[in-house]
């Protein structure tokens, strides 16, 4: 089997790039002849089509990337398999995707989104995202690399470090976590809440709003926002430095960092919805808060990134649930349980590590990819 993997290559620290890069690594370790290419580079892709002649192309992205992941290779008569995430709804390319022999999606929730918005599901298979469980491992708090992370973030050795990581923090549920911490503040052990966000123009105003919320709640002295650029090499140490990973995300098609936190032996706070129903086990590897609110959308303004002219108004036949809000009181209760009980944190962390290795290791995912392609397309 010869496979061309299309993604954000060379890989940035982002989730989609990591998703593609770990599949590539897993395939190569299995002995599969696999090569990477940037999903937007028409010239590079055509070069591979001509000399490599891949049996199959797998492309990482979402429905809006269909021209790059599917249409380009179809002009050359090569089988293309998009491996898709979801952004809450699907608003174009239904006929093109429905006609494909195979579509991969990152969770059962993503599959439901695509079926809700026009696909039959007959050609959709769930393939979860891989995790490098050799890098994301439990580490001792006294390890100088771990102690240095905590010290640099202003976290004392005896403080409970709660961590959220994302492009921005609000979309990962930071507002709900802050409100929960404000409820617990005077009753809880000493704590520090760290939000690691990616430096980009769209998040600057969001970060200010988040910090204003912390001030309004009276917990701003215990909330730290860090916006430095970091590589994937740093992430295992950042996650291993925390005591609790909190990400009751508002929109989560899979939840890669939640799995990485579990792989580091950390308990996770999530929400009982979306991709987290696939990745986390309530009461065992994580605590999943109930959904308190569903946010529905009647219309959206789209542009060329979605295959429309700029400013196109797309009206849904029925309002779509596009994201969720977790129960603040559930989060508060679960945080208190974990903050007060080191043994519970350790036990849930061990279960999380075990599940991450068994179900989400990148080698497991690569093997599953080969099995699906062989069964569905008869390519070996």
Task: Label the model's feature ranges.
Residues 237-242:
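Short alpha-helical donor nucleotide-sugar binding micro-motif in glycosyltransferases
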Residues 109, 130:
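Carbohydrate-associated surface elements
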Residues 156-172, 178-181, 194, 319:
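Conserved donor-binding/catalytic core segment of Leloir-type glycosyltransferases
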Residues 207-230:
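Nucleotide-activated donor-binding/catalytic signature segment of Leloir-type glycosyltransferases, i.e.
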Residues 267-270, 280, 287-289:
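Short hydrophobic beta-strand element within catalytic cores of glycosyltransferases
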Residues 250:
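Aromatic "clamp/platform" in nucleotide-sugar-dependent glycosyltransferases that forms part
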Residues 316-319, 330, 336-337, 344-358:
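A short, well-ordered alpha-helix in the C-terminal region of glycosyltransferases
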Residues 137-155:
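A short helix/loop element that forms part of the nucleotide-sugar donor recognition site in Leloir-type
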